[in-house]
Amino acid sequence: MSHSVEDIKSESRRLRGSLEQSLADAVTGALREDDQTLIKYHGSYQQDDRDIRDERRQQKLEPAYQFMIRTRTPGGVITPAQWLALDGIATRYANHSLRITTRQAFQFHGVIKRELKATMQAINATLIDTLAACGDVNRNVQVAANPLLSQAHATLYADAACVSEHLLPNTRAYYEIWLDEERVSGSGNEDEPIYGDRYLPRKFKIGFAAPPLNDVDVFANDLGFIAILRDGRLLGYNVSIGGGMGASHGDAQTWPRVANVIGFVTRDQLLDIATAVVTTQRDFGNRAVRKRARFKYTIDDHGLDTIVAEIARRAGFALQPAQPFAFEHNGDRYGWVEGEDGLWHLTLSLPAGRIADTDTATHLSGLRAIAQLNVGEFRMTPNQNLVIAGVPASERARVDALVAQYALDAGNRSASALARGAMACVALPTCGLAMAEAERYLPDFSAALQPLLQQHGLADTPIVLRLSGCPNGCSRPYLAEIALVGKAPGRYNLMLGGDRRGQRLNTLYRENITEPEILAALEPLLARYAAERDHANDEGFGDFLHRAGLIALPSYPTHRRLDLELLA
């Protein structure tokens, strides 16, 4: 018998439930129904292979249950030793691949139940965990991966890691179930000062951005911290609240939202403001209607001024006025760049973040070889790419030799700038919410679009493309200049008009259409863009569509164009 998510949380004995009994049940590859909810807080989702679901049903077999495991890696920074260990885990327990998420975490796919605990223990042995990587808690904290700002990145990373640790659940359930920690008196009744016994109404996302780069898409986060840098010195952070991508097809009560900038805080105020924002959502969020439970709806339902006043009351101080800042783009810089500290950083484009050895790529082997050099560190970017960071000039030649040997820079040499910067969620065959393909379709769609780009001289023009298998928007499609949002197998909603800076939502342009219809809809728009764009100001595709009157801002009830780019 299943229960409501709120009941499952409150009766779980601080996220324990009957997980240990579910794991021990050898009769099925699945967990008990309520435990399928609880395991999310431990960093895993129960899934099945949808490609063979019908076949197994015909054979009177249960679905091919498997588990996705997601790491908690604030800012996506790991050492070469950790990389090698995670590579080994993927090879031994998962489907021989690693996947970089849009929130700078790793996902392992294809882990079966009887190996779930061993996999969790192996991950923790690397000094990485999976606690709170999923569930109605604060998720993995994003950090700008800007390799040019070496000192700023180090400071942002330290602040983000501090916030991540501060907002972890206090329960010992994770350590008891997966790491065999001895139970003590009071086990199952630990105090949760931030989350309480029902945790948050829905998931919560935090990002740290470093202008002029908005690679984290900070305005898609529930809570954003925008670094204010002057002469290389970090003064503090502008605070943004209320971003979120998820929506439901055909439901006018749901919509994506860009965040509001509400003020400025100093570094020593970070934890107080983060706690105030999270607990405000905990107490004001909608627990009766789950699809309306995200913080963006809390703000829209109660009013921005009311929520900001409550945050200030809980923090014990009013935020200072927001400081000037400006974003230039939300993509990655590919190739080598030298940081302020004289170390070098190589950004590699990895299509949809998938790292595997296939018929056409040897990314897993190649990055293993680079990790074995034991130089620098690895940084996952919010665009699902990878930075080999902190490389001394004397080691560049060795890295370059391996990059060439394994063709790791093939993505950097993609036929179009659009393909290099495109993102996609996993979707089929493992995501239970997917309505259409995304990751597996991205190469084909990019290739289908390529002739149009070449025809109009746009192959080298950066256009933000994102694919999502469903309207929940894990690939942040609603901020893209071109987005496909899955509606049914082979059919998508075509969304147009976001911008390169991650500051404007796009708009539904055509609904429930196939690839030929998508290409037919895009061709005249790309033709006009090529002929009429403002070259002098490097006008983006989304900006052109609005200037030319070819598309309007979305008509979401609370959406308005926010003046986010303050004069620096």
Swiss-Prot record:
Phenotype when the gene is knocked out: Cells lacking this gene display a blocked APS- (adenosine-5'-phosphosulfate) or PAPS- (3'-phosphoadenosine-5'-phosphosulfate) dependent cysteine synthesis but do retain AvrXa21 activity.
Keyword annotations of the record: 4Fe-4S, Amino-acid biosynthesis, Cysteine biosynthesis, Heme, Iron, Iron-sulfur, Metal-binding, NADP, Oxidoreductase
GO cellular component, one term: sulfite reductase complex (NADPH)
Enzyme type, top EC level: oxidoreductase
Keyword Cell wall biogenesis/degradation recorded: no
PROSITE patterns: NIR_SIR (PS00365)
Domain of life: Bacteria
Reactions listed under catalytic activity: hydrogen sulfide + 3 NADP(+) + 3 H2O = sulfite + 3 NADPH + 4 H(+)
Cofactor(s) listed in the protein's UniProt record: siroheme; [4Fe-4S] cluster
Pathway the protein takes part in: Sulfur metabolism; hydrogen sulfide biosynthesis; hydrogen sulfide from sulfite (NADPH route): step 1/1
Record has Heme as a keyword: yes
Binding site for siroheme: 474
GO biological process, one term: sulfate assimilation
Assembly and binders: Alpha(8)-beta(8). The alpha component is a flavoprotein, the beta component is a hemoprotein.
Stated family: Belongs to the nitrite and sulfite reductase 4Fe-4S domain family.
Function (record text): Component of the sulfite reductase complex that catalyzes the 6-electron reduction of sulfite to sulfide. This is one of several activities required for the biosynthesis of L-cysteine from sulfate.
Cited NCBIfam families: CysI, PRK13504.1
PANTHER family in UniProt: SULFITE REDUCTASE [NADPH] SUBUNIT BETA, SULFITE REDUCTASE [NADPH] SUBUNIT BETA-RELATED
Protein name: Sulfite reductase [NADPH] hemoprotein beta-component
